[in-house]
């Protein structure tokens, strides 16, 4: 089984088998099918409920080889999906260990148009039959590892300038890198509320950096609504902490998909699907949203298809490019950044505007799938160990939330609800040609910028 790396600096370690996930707080209720496709959608939900029941208390072992992710093409109709599900049901013996374990569904769409796919345990015969379909993609579940270790031990626009110790905030608010006397320059207060989903290891919501703006959304990793690793809390602090965050006004929603250093891709996809459904269900009153995922894994057509749905719904996605010092086009979902408007793949630079290089041959990924670079070396942010502590980490995991926070900031200061593509253009096209050209290796010469400081 291939291991994937998510993007702070360390080597990958496999976690123990995942415990059964806790129920997702505030999760959307089961869909009540409505509309012309109601019968087809109802039949889909019926099969999913029947097959998944046998796995209710199943603990996912990361070494299992027979788990698969199935994602339907965006062109597939609800009737076509229902037909494929019925075919699958005819192949699954009720007493066997085969079957759908969970759905990848957006139940806010009660006509079934949000049924994106499913995860299941299937033998080779069933997998071969599934692959005969022209309207779906079938792939083995893979492992995404989350290395998480400190990199070091320790009208008229109303403009606000704040002295900061965090060089990253200074960099994204100036055209050129500053040398000391760092200051974060931005518009004083966003006029419109935003929501930022952090799909990660959870958030220490009680940390003083968050001022009550961080909440638990869903937990697909274990039964503890706590960040036991620190990765998610650090990321959230960069997105929206009051001292170290880009947008200190955004609401932060924790979507936990990592309990240990590793998680199944299927679990990450479930977290993503929950976040997208939650955003859609609240979009009428809170339309300005972003999602941060500081991780990735081997190329996955099913994941790429699934995550592309976010921008169609109006949710901007920021993704870390990776720390392997290789072409970012080799990882998912970061490989879709360069070609999908509204999904931003983020590389890392250091305080001297050089593409980040770390010990052990690690460095920021690069190439045409990278959309923009942002500060990722020696970043100070919130610690998971106390309600007031800080930690210093490095990686594209740290660059990514600078961009997610910047996207939230742009959404908050504009009266018009900008599309993900419009926000991406503001971030990636406002500060170009400023990096040394020697090691770009096909990457864009662009640094994330808020358009304020000179």
From Swiss-Prot:
Q: Where is the Peptidase S8 domain?
A: 166-454
Point out the glycosylated residues in this chain.
123
Q: How is it modified after translation?
A: The pro-region is removed through cleavage by XPR6 after Lys156-Arg157, which yields mature active XPR2.
InterPro entries reported in the protein's UniProt record: PCSK9_ProteinaseK-like, Peptidase_S8/S53_dom, Peptidase_S8/S53_dom_sf, Peptidase_S8_Asp-AS, Peptidase_S8_His-AS, Peptidase_S8_Ser-AS, Peptidase_S8_subtilisin-like, Peptidase_S8_subtilisin-rel
Q: Which residues form the propeptide?
A: 16-157
Q: How does activity depend on pH?
A: Optimum pH is 9.0-10.0.
How do changes in temperature affect this protein's function?
A: Optimum temperature is 40 degrees Celsius.
Q: Which Pfam families match?
A: Inhibitor_I9 (PF05922), Peptidase_S8 (PF00082)
* An example Gene Ontology CC term for this record: extracellular space
Catalytic activity of the protein: Hydrolysis of proteins with broad specificity for peptide bonds, and a preference for a large uncharged residue in P1. Hydrolyzes peptide amides
Q: What is its main location?
A: secreted
- In this chain the Inhibitor I9 domain maps to 68-146
Name the job this protein performs. Major secreted protein that belongs to the subtilisin family serine proteases.
What is the protein name for this chain?
A: Alkaline extracellular protease
Q: Which organism is it from?
A: Yarrowia lipolytica (strain CLIB 122 / E 150)
The gene for this chain is XPR2
């Amino acid at each position: 089984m291939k291991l994937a790396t998510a993007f702070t600096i360390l080597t990958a370690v496999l976690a123990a088998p995942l415990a059964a996930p806790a129920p997702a707080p505030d999760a959307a209720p089961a869909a009540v099918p409505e509309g012309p496709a109601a019968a087809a959608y109802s039949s889909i939900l019926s099969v999913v409920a029947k097959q998944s029941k046998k796995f209710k208390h199943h603990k996912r072992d990361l070494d299992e080889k027979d788990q698969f992710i199935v994602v339907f093409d965006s062109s597939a109709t609800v009737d076509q999906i229902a037909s494929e599900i019925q075919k699958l049901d005819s192949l699954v013996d009720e007493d066997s260990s085969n079957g759908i374990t969970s759905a990848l569904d957006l139940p806010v769409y009660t006509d079934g148009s949000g049924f994106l796919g499913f995860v299941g345990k299937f033998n080779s015969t069933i997998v071969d039959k599934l692959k005969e379909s022209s309207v779906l993609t079938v792939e083995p579940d893979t492992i995404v590892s989350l290395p998480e270790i400190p990199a070091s031990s320790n009208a008229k626009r109303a403009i606000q300038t704040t002295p900061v110790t965090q060089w990253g905030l200074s960099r994204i608010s100036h055209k050129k890198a500053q040398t000391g006397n760092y200051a974060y320059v931005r518009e004083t207060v966003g006029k419109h509320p935003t929501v930022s989903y952090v799909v990660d290891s959870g958030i220490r919501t009680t940390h003083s950096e968050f001022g009550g703006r961080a909440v638990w959304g869903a937990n697909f990793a274990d039964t503890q609504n706590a960040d036991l690793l620190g990765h998610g809390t650090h990321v959230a602090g960069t997105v929206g902490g009051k001292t170290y965050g880009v947008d200190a006004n955004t609401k932060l929603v924790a979507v936990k998909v990592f309990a240990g250093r590793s998680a199944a891709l299927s679990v990450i996809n479930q977290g993503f699907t929950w976040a997208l459904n939650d955003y859609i269900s609240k979009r009428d009153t809170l339309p300005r949203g972003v999602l941060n995922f500081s991780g990735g894994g081997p190329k996955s057509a099913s994941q790429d298809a699934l995550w592309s749905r976010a921008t169609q719904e109006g949710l901007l996605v920021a993704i870390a490019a990776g720390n392997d010092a290789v072409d970012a086009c080799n990882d998912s979902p970061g490989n879709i950044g360069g070609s999908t408007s509204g999904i931003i793949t983020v590389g890392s630079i250091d305080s001297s505007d050089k593409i980040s290089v770390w010990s052990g041959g690690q460095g920021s990924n690069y190439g045409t799938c990278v959309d923009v670079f942002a500060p990722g070396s020696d970043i100070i942010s919130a610690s998971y160990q106390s309600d007031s502590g800080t930690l210093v980490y490095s990686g594209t995991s740290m660059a990514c939330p600078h961009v997610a926070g910047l996207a939230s900031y742009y959404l908050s200061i504009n009266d018009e609800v900008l599309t993900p593509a419009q926000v991406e253009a503001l971030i990636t096209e406002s500060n170009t040609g400023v990096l040394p050209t020697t090691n770009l290796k096909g990457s864009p010469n662009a640094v994330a910028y808020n358009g304020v400081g000179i």
